[in-house]
Amino acid sequence: MSEDSASVHASAVKIGNFAVLIRGPSGSGKSRLAYDLIMAGRAGVVERAVLVGDDRVHLATLGNEIVVRPALILAGLIEIRGLGIRRCDFVEHATVGLVVDLAAPDAERLPPPDALITCISGVKIPRIPVGAGYQPFPLVVAALTTTKSSSSVNSSGDCLKGNGNHISPTIATG
């Protein structure tokens, strides 16, 4: 790993082969979204979902990827508002495939393409900016289970059968 690893105030959940990195100010719902995604994985709404870390994670560059790890002191712990700190299954690392920015000041109804990409240590990663007061869960599930619209329309109407991209690195650009 590179020397430029950093500790950041964020949560992360591995879904399938990639992690969703959830950033935002204190109280913006990072832990709640992480827990909701884990439960969505258990319910089969998204691929299997496992906590990487909650509240504080470490990011490091590995080639052209960003790897996220839990802070050692917080590994396997998640805050559930109203219940406190709880133990949770976790993985020791995952490659970041999607970034969700909560309370993002640049969130728009139809964001321009450049708003749907972020750059961490020189690595471009698909991004979902979520405005303050908006529910991030449906946006993240949609990003994980649907593909970007194009001139050809799939009339089957079934977003979950075989055509979802499940955190494809081209999620925001494809």
Cite the ranges covered by each PLM segment:
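A short, compositionally biased
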Residues: 7-9, 53-54, 112
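Glycine-rich phosphate-binding P-loop
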Residues: 18-43
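Conserved nucleotide-sensing/catalytic segment adjacent to the nucleotide-binding pocket
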Residues: 44-101
